[in-house]
Amino acid sequence: MALRLNPIPTQTFSLPQMASLRSPRFRMASTLRSGSKEVENIKKPFTPPREVHVQVTHSMPPQKIEIFQSLEDWAEENILAHLKPVEKCWQPQDFLPDPSSDGFEEQVKELRERAKELPDDYFVVLVGDMITEEALPTYQTMLNTLDGVRDETGASLTSWAIWTRAWTAEENRHGDLLNKYLYLSGRVDMKQIEKTIQYLIGSGMDPRTENSPYLGFIYTSFQERATFISHGNTARLAKEHGDIKLAQICGMIASDEKRHETAYTKIVEKLFESDPDGTVMAFADMMRKKIAMPAHLMYDGRDDNLFDNYSSVAQRIGVYTAKDYADILEFLVGRWKVEQLTGLSGEGRKAQEYICGLPPRIRRLEERAQARVKESSTLKFSWIHDRESTTLNAPREEHGEIFRQYRSEKC
């Protein structure tokens, strides 16, 4: 049975922040324990930079845990195979100046010279990507909320627990590498970045996966492909600006994300084989909610709309766009052969119809939104010493409307 906690009014991804629910000093995530106006008006320490949704827990029927228990051997053979032995993995030091070498200072100087050719807009996006990677403790925590697959002891030898720990260990290199690169580049305000990371980890994330591995693995499938695209595009742009070393860094991270995407999509593919009706309804549920980006609770101590503003720069320079969102959904629909599912219940068929019709609907809404965005504006980002970066004009209103509209449509 699903437990509904903390009845806070839901808001879309793009609504303005609610200052009355935040302390002026602390803005890390918490969930209010009452829906009363009296409680809502009290500023609490460590409250979120934006409200989280109504919290639903343990929505998966307990008997479905048996499905994941029965897939233990399958996961060992088919999912753990997508991990690399530590000794065969690249490490951040492979791509950075060697501090123990006599040429360290010269190598740093060369890195900084290359970094000078990169525009501020690019650094805003690279910093945002790095901060997202650095919030890894949150993502491991999220995976360990999932019923039937969590690491029950911290060192469990189940296939699911081994995957979660090893995946986390591989992902840990990404934030380490980008963090060190940005530190050496001299182009960014590291203290503001470090504060943003601390705020974000303290805030957590609100993926609305309800402790369900169905929802959780659909979410991670989408997110790994999104990060693969994002890092691939930062690699492309670095190359265009002449920084081949940085392009290599971003490309190696993208390669990891692609491998992880393959593992997660394979899990969901197996769920479609084992329980097509339950899986297609979970897919539709996740898409109705909209896939929230992992760093959507991002805050730097100053900008209440930091994530939206960072996302707008990423959209403008072509690192991650609304078109990419539709492309990912279309890819997953094809990858999991959703259109070809048969023998579904009435609710399952409605979910199937909804999902298959969603990509073109998002594209149409995005085209209309783009037609209305005729200008751009500039905003200061603390990450780049309050220099200005160009954003799309009214990004939250225009692009948020896309998701408000498609989420409101019924099956």
From Swiss-Prot:
Q: Which domain of life is it from?
A: Eukaryota
GO biological process assignments: defense response; fatty acid biosynthetic process; fatty acid metabolic process
Q: Where is the transit peptide?
A: 1-28
GO MF entries = metal ion binding; stearoyl-[ACP] desaturase activity; stearoyl-CoA 9-desaturase activity
What reaction does this enzyme carry out catalytically?
A: octadecanoyl-[ACP] + 2 reduced [2Fe-2S]-[ferredoxin] + O2 + 2 H(+) = (9Z)-octadecenoyl-[ACP] + 2 oxidized [2Fe-2S]-[ferredoxin] + 2 H2O
Q: What's one GO-annotated cellular component? A: chloroplast
Q: Which residues bind Fe cation 1?
A: 133, 171, 174, 257
- Localization annotation: Plastid, Chloroplast; Plastid
Gene3D superfamilies assigned to the protein according to its UniProt record, in alphabetical order? Ribonucleotide Reductase, subunit A (1.10.620.20)
User: What class does this enzyme belong to in the EC scheme?
Assistant: oxidoreductase
- Listed binding positions for Fe cation 2 are 171, 224, 257, 260
Q: One Pfam annotation, family name?
A: FA_desaturase_2
Quote the record's cofactor note.
Binds 2 Fe(2+) ions per subunit.
Give cofactor(s), names only.
Fe(2+)
Which pathway is this protein assigned to?
Lipid metabolism; fatty acid metabolism
Cite the EC number: 1.14.19.2
User: What UniProt keywords apply to this chain's record, in alphabetical order?
Assistant: Chloroplast, Fatty acid biosynthesis, Fatty acid metabolism, Iron, Lipid biosynthesis, Lipid metabolism, Metal-binding, Oxidoreductase, Plastid, Transit peptide
The secretion signal range is: none
Q: Which InterPro entries match?
A: FADS-2_CS (IPR005803), Fatty_acid_desaturase-2 (IPR005067), Ferritin-like_SF (IPR009078), RNR-like (IPR012348)
Which family does the similarity line name? Belongs to the fatty acid desaturase type 2 family.
Question: Quaternary form?
Answer: Homodimer.
Functional note:
Converts stearoyl-ACP to oleoyl-ACP by introduction of a cis double bond between carbons 9 and 10 of the acyl chain.
Under which name does UniProt file this protein? Stearoyl-[acyl-carrier-protein] 9-desaturase, chloroplastic
- Give the organism, scientific name: Glycine max (Soybean)
Q: Which gene encodes it?
A: ACPD
